[in-house]
């Protein structure tokens, strides 16, 4: 199994040889001018990693009553497949009121505004300034003897100034690309909050319902054990059983009773977790009723194609954004080693008095081109470039690891579904046998064939089976939910009117706020 990546170019910047000053001439000058007009950007152009050549373990065509649709898509409202109105209401309330989701939305909006701010650096910067000063000058300033002319006077100036970085080698554009990748990263983090929130609400709802039924089953079991203990004690007093049997019944009763407080504690934790997920305080009593028998298993289970999975999971997309950001930073570091070209222009009305400030004679202007080339910086710029390359390689390795983790999570979910279904079927068979044994014991007791103790023992075995079956049933629901989450959560299929938040669900458009031709991306 191998995850392949598009490698980062490790050759010298391609423009370095072309800009060599050795043997200069008209051809070289033409090349420099052409580069300035074209606005070339040094550094690697990012390309999305190819879909990995990873396969799932051979999926079954069906898991119990559920069919597996290989290549099937995940519904945006997959939680509705469990057919519970109470669950649907909880998810919608969480999407509306969860503070973490609201915080993620504002964080995304802030990142988008930051991208717009950074993008502004690619455009000419125009300012209007005004200045008023009073100074004393001497003749030496005017190339005259110091005492030839001494004057104290006012100076007034008003006018615009323009500065523009031509960005010949793409330092600014790579910086904007880096910021755009970072904005995408924030957007996919927000998507991760969204899909994780839905999954947590669904799983906690299952746990909340299951814990209530576990409490009920345990209380019924305690009642049966209490009756069994009372009967054993009566038999001991009549000399029909031993003291050891009575103590054993007592220990079993109290051990089972001791589990009730812990079950109630877990039930309260699940309740408080649901309140937190839906943005409510612990004293709120508005949770809808939830019971396991109100849920239904989804009839079909989708299994996305491997090539689709890496385009669906927010964590993989976030890792891709990190890789893109690192790629752009390599370009920023490379561009810092090349010359910078800046145009500056100024126009002003300057005068020693306000009366003639706006006359034609008071007009002044200047325009110029500034060129700066780093010559000696102690190896700092080269080290920064090597650092950026290592950051890229680190991001590349992290991306591969994230992709592998994604496939493992899907495989784990599928295997859990299969194993827990097998376990459920076995528990169900055992429960049917325990129910039949209990019913038979009751009939035999009514006919005087067995003692009451036999009936109570059969009833106890049945209640133990009910308790185990509740846990097994809840686990199957959780396995299905975990599969939907592992496949990406279906956020790409959510409609705006389905209760989702458009600011979270809409993918961040790369350079959406920009109008830069020749964007330095190579993306499908």
Where on the chain are the PLM-derived regions?
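N-terminal secretory signal peptides that target proteins for export/translocation
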Residues: 1-22
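Terminal intrinsically disordered/low-complexity segments used for targeting and assembly
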Residues: 2-3, 7, 25-96, 143, ...
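Short flexible linkers and secondary-structure junctions
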Residues: 41-200, 340-345, 364, 375-385
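Membrane-embedded beta-strand positions in outer-membrane beta-barrel channels/transporters
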Residues: 91, 157-161, 205, 306, ...
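Sec/SRP-type N-terminal targeting helices
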Residues: 102-103, 119-120, 166-194, 244, ...
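Structural signature of outer-membrane beta-barrel domains
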Residues: 133-137, 277, 348-352
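Outer-membrane beta-barrel proteins
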Residues: 137-141, 243, 352-356
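Periplasmic alpha-helical coiled-coil/stalk elements that build and connect Gram-negative outer-membrane
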Residues: 172, 188-305, 416, 420, ...
